[in-house]
Design a protein with these regions (language model features):
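Active-site-adjacent loop/tail segments of enzyme domains
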Residues: 134-160
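Accessory terminal helices/loops
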Residues: 151-161, 170-253
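Divalent metal-coordination and catalytic microenvironments
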Residues: 17, 28, 53, 65, ...
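Core dinuclear metal-dependent hydrolase active-site scaffold
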Residues: 16, 93-124, 155
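Active-site metal-binding loops of divalent metal-dependent hydrolases
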Residues: 29-31, 54, 78-79, 111-112, ...
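Active-site HxH/HxHxD metal-binding segment of metal-dependent hydrolases
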Residues: 9-10, 24, 31-106, 192
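Conserved beta-strand hairpin/beta-sheet module of binuclear metal-dependent hydrolase folds
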Residues: 1-44, 116-131
């Protein structure tokens, strides 16, 4: 399976997966034109569309693509996603014959209440829940819900590749540095990110193990993040620590 991040809109990624026989899947197609161009350039046939949540920058092109290609649209059970043809839920499995791939569906509420992730082919397609060096804003869910969702993702194999929905890594990295300025693995990641963005190259996908070593939202149980929280008057449970770091990020940018 080949993975291609398609830049779209302001800073979104539409994820394109395809096999050697020309069969393709797209994830969170906010812009149908970007997908059509990529399919034509690679001579691919669109076989399925996966949606993680209802925000327009992730679903805006789904209806048009379904109309053009008759590809099923897998989506959360959320009436705000009108383009859905197959509603999926936590614990479901999606099995496709062309391309031959299987995805496990995981509910990860927080950014939105009906947010889903798709796990398969060595990939974590996680929309706006987990970014490199960051996580999504809590538009609908609570800090406890978001932390529980991130815990679920953190338990996945370390080699799985995180495919978030936006190119936010530089800004996220600057914030992460304020939380853990002495983290050597974070320093290395920031150097890599700077070099990649200087060449206009994506900073995703990234192995989950590297996020576990550098992403402050996955590290609320570490001594370093706990120390930062104590410096800011938070000496409580892990949900409070997560909420404090998320609030600080909201004020950071």
């Amino acid at each position: 399976m080949h993975l291609v991040p398609l830049p779209a809109l302001l800073d979104n990624y539409i994820w394109l997966l395809h096999d050697d026989d020309g069969n393709a899947i797209v994830v969170d197609p906010g812009d149908a034109g970007v997908v059509e161009h990529a399919l034509a350039a690679r001579q691919l046939r669109l076989r399925a569309i996966l949606l993680t949540h209802h925000h327009h920058d992730h679903i805006g092109g789904a209806a048009e693509l379904h109309g053009q290609h008759a590809a099923p649209v897998y989506a959360p059970d959320d009436e705000r996603i009108e383009a859905a043809t197959v509603r999926v839920h936590d614990g479901d499995t999606i099995e496709l014959a062309s391309p031959r791939v299987r995805f496990d569906v995981i509910a990860i509420p927080g950014h939105t209440l009906s947010h889903l992730a798709y796990v398969g082919a060595g990939l974590l397609l996680c929309g706006d829940t987990l970014f490199s060096l960051g996580c999504g804003r809590l538009f609908e869910g609570s800090p406890a819900q978001m932390l529980a969702s991130l815990d679920r993702l953190s338990s996945l194999p370390g080699e799985i590749l995180v495919c978030g929905g936006h190119e936010y890594t530089e800004t996220n990295g600057r914030f992460a540095h304020t939380i853990e300025p002495e983290n050597p693995e974070l320093h290395q990641r920031l150097q890599e990110v700077s070099a990649l963005r200087a060449q206009l190259r994506p900073t995703l996908p990234i192995a989950l193990a590297r996020e576990l070593a550098t992403n402050p939202f996955l590290r609320v149980d570490t001594d370093a993040v706990a120390a930062w929280c104590r410096q800011h008057g938070i000496d409580s449970d892990r949900v409070a620590r997560f909420a404090a770091v998320r609030a600080a990020k909201d004020e950071f940018c």
